[in-house]
């Protein structure tokens, strides 16, 4: 949709009016400079005029080359998502100048992979297939990957409040060759199961620091054992990612799931990491000879 209202309460601005277009560009530059912003999340990207959006993004990138802009193309089709990323080889020649786009296809694959029963085309293979589409994207590592956000059910709710699956999701969020976005409360199993799709509940205050709060997630006071364990795992995973060149910038090698087990490796010049993900209820013994490419590891963690 290029003309009309996105919803009745949000009238479109006329981006084809040169005075309006110039004002919006100048206004964006002013706010970036005044507040020292590091990035913009641009909502509902395809609903804007594409020619103007390219001019807007280019103007910002020219003035602030290290500035980040993430566009929201809420589609589960990677072809539509990839179209909007800068330098994409689009058939119509369109150049967006947009550095990053939200990876909704991989978000859906994450949930489907963990909640669907394993079969030849369902379960972990859905994640494997989605990640294998990276050849299409111009810069897949710049895509923003999330388990949930402020507009969809909490990740813990999407996973039917299964803590084991939630922990697997956190591991994939940390390990994926993407730029992760983490919604507050994911680390303490915040959920909206009582009212699915209710934005008020999805956006509930983070517990702790507010008058009358009985739970303080900053100090762990009042958290359940499962919440504490999840918070600890969350911290370990993303502290590791913050130190790891391989997890942030390295190459990726992964294997088709086998018997409910998925293996993914991230590696850089002097570092290798591998994740074995077991979706089964029971332990599985891994035959490392099946993964001959993954040699040279000297530390293992459960």
Mark where each language-model region is.
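Aromatic- and acidic-residue-enriched carbohydrate-binding clefts of CAZyme catalytic domains
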Residues: 1-14, 203-212
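Surface beta-strand/loop "capping" patches
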Residues: 249-271
């Amino acid at each position: 949709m290029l003309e009309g209202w996105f919803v009745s309460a949000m009238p479109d601005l006329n981006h084809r009016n040169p005075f309006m277009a110039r004002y919006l560009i100048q206004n964006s530059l002013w706010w970036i400079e005044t507040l020292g912003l590091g990035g913009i999340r641009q909502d509902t990207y395809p609903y804007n005029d594409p020619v103007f959006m390219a001019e807007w993004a280019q103007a910002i990138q020219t003035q602030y080359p290290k500035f980040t802009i993430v566009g929201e193309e809420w589609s589960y089709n990677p072809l539509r998502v990839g179209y909007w990323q800068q330098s994409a080889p689009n058939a119509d020649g369109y150049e967006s100048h947009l550095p990053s786009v939200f990876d909704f296809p991989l978000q859906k694959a994450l949930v489907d992979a963990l909640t669907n029963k394993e079969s030849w085309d369902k379960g972990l293979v859905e994640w494997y297939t989605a990640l294998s589409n990276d050849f299409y994207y111009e810069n897949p590592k710049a895509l923003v990957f999330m388990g949930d956000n402020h507009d969809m059910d909490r990740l813990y709710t999407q996973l039917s409040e299964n803590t084991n699956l939630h922990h697997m999701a956190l591991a994939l969020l940390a390990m994926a060759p993407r730029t992760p976005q983490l919604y507050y409360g994911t680390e303490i199993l915040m959920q909206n199961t009582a009212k699915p799709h209710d934005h008020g509940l999805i956006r509930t205050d983070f517990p702790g620091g507010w008058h009358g709060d009985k739970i303080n997630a900053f100090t762990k006071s009042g958290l359940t054992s499962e919440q504490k364990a999840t918070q600890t795992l969350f911290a370990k995973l993303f502290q590791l990612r913050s130190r790891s060149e391989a997890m942030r910038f390295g190459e990726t090698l992964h294997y088709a799931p086998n018997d409910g087990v998925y293996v993914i490796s991230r590696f850089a010049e002097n570092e290798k990491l591998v994740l074995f993900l077991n979706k089964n209820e029971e332990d599985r013994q891994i035959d490392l000879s099946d993964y001959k490419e993954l040699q040279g590891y000297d530390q293992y963690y459960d």
